[in-house]
Amino acid sequence: MEVVTLFELYELEERLRARGFCHDTREGAPICRWLVERVTVDVMPTEATVLGMASEWFHEAVTTAARMDLGDGLKAPVIKRPHFLATKLTAYRDRGAKDPYMSKDLEDIVTLFDGCQETGFLLEDGSSSLKNFITSGMQVHLENPEFVEAVEGCFRSDPVSRERSRIVLERMRAIATARS
């Protein structure tokens, strides 16, 4: 479901509450996060005027989302990985780049790269403009020594974690130099 207006967001929130969802009120939780049992759902409007957050990729992410079967006849739209990365790169650019060491968006980007064996999937299923945005964004960020240092800072200082950090940066560089 695409939410464009504040009224539509309120309607969706009422529907979520009726199904047992509640806002995640834990410290550090984003304002868009909802919980039910062990399921976590982030509900993001596609228009910036609704929650004051925007990404030029939200609309495309919603319209190209895959449907995931959650069982019991319940299906949920899940945005594709390239769109998730693009929305996180946008969020990092708009709010996290000012202080990369404290950026939750950078942590999410690092987690995405840390959790993949191959980087190609981060560019699959995306338009050329999306792929160009991702590759150029990664190029710009990797040129910033504070970004690289903050990525390294997302890991512990033991040898295994240092190696993970090196692998993540290597994967980021592979995306930055990929051609669509």
Regions flagged by a language model, labelled:
Residues M1-S180:
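Compositionally biased terminal segments of proteins
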